[in-house]
């Protein structure tokens, strides 16, 4: 269902400006593959991928957002290269330009999760450099916190599901507690060590969606 995307059309010059698929990409693909049967049966109507994309194509309406216009351009070519229908590609941060409040049923986010100085995080996002794909500010959570703060207003009230990549430094257990305290169900669906990184994929969902995914 979710093969590793073919990016052979992209060159080393492209990867000076666009994030190259790496272990965080692959663990997210594997987590979605593990849930593939439930997701296909679930038939999400609206899917949104934010930032580093895995080129998922299991929804009727598919949106991708990124602050980097070169990343969106590369994504358009990659969808074509892999024989996938073109999504709606939108240059924005998170969901700022979208009017899809409480409509997103499947949200996929591989954020910039590396702990950096907040100044480096701000500079990377302001300059739209490649480091914006990994520089995460304090605890590597600056952008993730912005999304989680808005999650109740983003996800569909019954069917909303978020797949989120995190590393140990992001304190996944604290993310889970925070989201459970906010009325969501949250679990680690996959974790893996890749070099110095301890990667996790969290599934954060509305209670009714969680029940379906656990069947």
Stretch-by-stretch model annotation:
Residues 1-215:
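Auxiliary N-terminal substrate/complex-recognition segments of SAM-dependent methyltransferases
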